[in-house]
Regions:
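Short beta-strand-to-loop acidic/aromatic patch adjacent to the donor-nucleotide binding site
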Residues: 102-114
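Short, acidic, metal-binding catalytic loop of nucleotide-sugar glycosyltransferases
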Residues: 26-44
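A conserved acidic beta->alpha catalytic loop
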Residues: 51-61
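A conserved hydrophobic helix/loop-capping motif in glycosyltransferases and polysaccharide synthases
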Residues: 8-24, 31, 51
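Glycine-rich, basic loop-to-helix element that forms the pyrophosphate-binding segment
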Residues: 79-99
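A recurrent flexible, glycine/aromatic-enriched loop bordering the glycosyltransferase active site
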Residues: 169-190, 257-259
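Short beta-strand-to-loop element that shapes/binds the nucleotide-sugar donor at the catalytic cleft/hinge
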Residues: 135-154
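Non-catalytic, C-terminal membrane-associated alpha-helical segments of glycosyltransferases
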Residues: 246-307
Length: 307
């Protein structure tokens, strides 16, 4: 019997990180090739949908050449440089939905993430786990470790330790998939039926939090959200720690701090939106603390230590 190809739309967005983006696409192609060699249930028919969000360093052109060399279909769409992560990923996802092909899965992939050679086997194994355990496919987040340090986990999925304060614990691999409360989209594998149920990333997000919202809303709908059984890729944690950001903000004037916190990369707006949509009971207190963060940063970080 002839095996059916599994159709996967790969979704990425990029902005002036040519070398990182090329490394990501190279490991993607390696993982696809590895799966084609070892697959027992059909090959992958993949196509890359990349948002070029105002790149000036030739990222999109270099990716196009790499895809041509590696025989990977691609559609590259231009942004204006102001889409940021959430906007760029939404645009790539919308392009995939408009494509003439009908996709079985969508793989959201950060351009600073390097896939393990057997990444697709891990993702499909996690889907089989969802089917066996929950009776349906779900959202799978690939666990990532720091580059060159497999003992330090960086992204994947988290479970709440205290839902009211939003304290969370990052899951580490245990040899089988684990259910999580919310998931990161460094490597996020979404079946088409989930998209039919809840659509794509919510349009209100500019940069961050959209992946957390998406996975949390899926859990509310009864859709399983799990992490892979093993490390699925590598990606360095690129967010400043509390000590560094508190030192930076406390040294700023009020005007500097306000402008900093208005920038999409640091804005409170995405976090407040996520809180209002996912944890509305926590929103008033979160809004208050965000104001304290702006007006009284020393007091805010003193309170943070007391949590």
């Amino acid at each position: 019997m002839m095996k059916k190809d599994i159709k996967i739309a790969i979704l990425m967005t990029c902005h002036n990180r040519k070398e990182k983006t090329l490394q990501c696409v190279s490991t993607l192609c390696d993982a696809l090739a590895r799966y084609h060699v070892s697959a027992s249930d059909g090959n992958i028919d993949a196509k890359l949908f990349l948002t070029d969000d105002g790149c000036t360093d030739g990222t999109a052109e270099a990716v196009g050449r790499e895809c041509h060399t590696r025989n990977l279909q691609r559609t590259i769409v231009k942004g204006d440089g102001n889409l940021y992560w959430a906007g760029g990923m939404r645009l790539a996802w919308m392009m995939a939905l408009k494509d003439e092909q009908s996709w079985n899965y969508y793989l959201l992939l950060n351009d600073d993430t390097l896939l393990q050679p057997d990444a697709f086997s891990m993702l499909f194994n996690a889907q089989r786990y969802c089917l066996d355990t929950y009776g349906c496919e779900g959202i799978v987040s690939g666990i990532t470790s720091a580059i060159g340090d497999s003992s330090t986990m960086t992204y994947g999925g988290e479970v709440f330790v205290n839902k009211f304060t939003c304290r969370r614990r990052l899951l580490t691999p245990i040899g089988k998939p684990q259910l999580c409360d919310w998931a990161h989209a460094n490597i996020l594998f979404v079946p088409h039926q989930v998209v039919e149920t809840q659509g794509i990333l919510y349009k209100g997000y500019v940069h961050g939090q959209a992946d957390l919202d998406y996975s949390y809303k899926a859990r509310q709908r009864g859709i399983p959200v799990v992490v892979t059984a093993q490390i699925c890729g590598t990606c360095n944690f690129d967010h400043p720690d509390v000590a560094a950001i508190s030192k930076l903000l406390c040294a700023m004037t009020f005007s500097e701090r306000r402008n900093y916190l208005k920038h999409p990369l640091h804005s409170d707006a995405d976090y407040l939106l996520m809180t209002r949509r996912c944890m509305p009971q926590k929103y008033p207190l979160t809004w208050l603390f965000r104001k304290i963060h702006l007006y009284l940063p020393h007091f805010y970080y003193w309170l943070h230590k007391k949590r």
